[in-house]
Swiss-Prot record:
Protein name (database record): Putative F-box protein At3g18340
SMART domains: FBOX
Domain of life: Eukaryota
Listed Pfam families: F-box, FBA_1
InterPro entries: A_thaliana_F-box, F-box-assoc_dom_typ1, F-box-assoc_interact_dom, F-box-like_dom_sf, F-box_dom
Species in which this protein is naturally found: Arabidopsis thaliana (Mouse-ear cress)
Domain F-box: 1-46
Amino acid sequence: MASGKLPWELEEEILCRLPPGSLVRLRSVCKHWNDLYNDKWFIKKSLGFARPQFIILAGFKIYSIGTIGLDVVDPKIEAEKWAFTRITACNGLLFRDFWNQGVTIWNPWLRQVGWIEYKEDKDFRFCGIGYDAGKPEKGYKIFGYFNRFYDTKLKIGHRFAIFECASQAFKFIDSPEWPTLAGRGEYVSLNGNLYWTAYNEDTREHFLGSFDFSTEISMHFCLLPCAKHVSGLQDKLVLTVFKGDRFALLKQSRISSNTEIWVTKDKINSSNNVVWLNLMTLSIPDFPSLFHQLSDISYFIHDMTLILCCDDNQTGVGCIFIARGDLCKKIQINYVSLGFSQCVYLPSLTSVPLEFRSLQV
């Protein structure tokens, strides 16, 4: 009996559900399968089936808590020169900030790396990355600031700026009022915009600050589901992307130590009419305190289970905590200790733009 051939639509449906690593190995099977790597619809659909993983920068190496092990971002860069670096994700790509020097842009699954250099003013503090969502091509832009002395008492202020990666030029952004800056590793990119948690000292309210790269405007995006506390007693808040188009907010009380997970009811768009829903509340003695962490904190939610990566309170070693209901399991990460940078990453088939691509690794 002659073997039948699957309809092309069914083949695509099967292929988009495979892990990116498997897809990379299959691209040489035929031209049609290889062409999928340039199909924006296929790339977007496969991203919807990707499983989150932690990407951890420890010492001079990068690791993933998942199915692959990752090496140094760019083997041509001397790692010992870069003591202060951070890693973040945006639109299926990884971005590693090399303090005062530039940023690498990277897709480990496609083995593509690019380098974005601050050629003019290297005293630039990286906050996060985004793009103009209204344009068909992603023109990546880096949001950050310069420290500036602006009186005879040498008080330090911030001069906000955008580094446009395509033109490799800085553009200063002047605004009469800026939300409070977030801490290290606390900026989240969604739909091209940048978001962070902030606190208003006057009203004692927690809110989301945002920066829209299409309008180049910063704003108070929405209030957060937090009680009002005086300064010094605020909850610990950690923002992340939920289901690809929403937000999740981890909230740990400084007073009770209870941990809550809140999620937005609807997809995030330009409207600031945001409704928050309580997804889960954890009251577990073994759950870590997230106050005074020396490393980044990241997490994702899968099947009503919280998977969290942070320092262990007793040893300072990096750990994965898996919490659900009244149960919590701790898994120690070997060779990862105090001060590591990390992020949650969805493996994707998004290519590094050709203008930045420096090498294949």
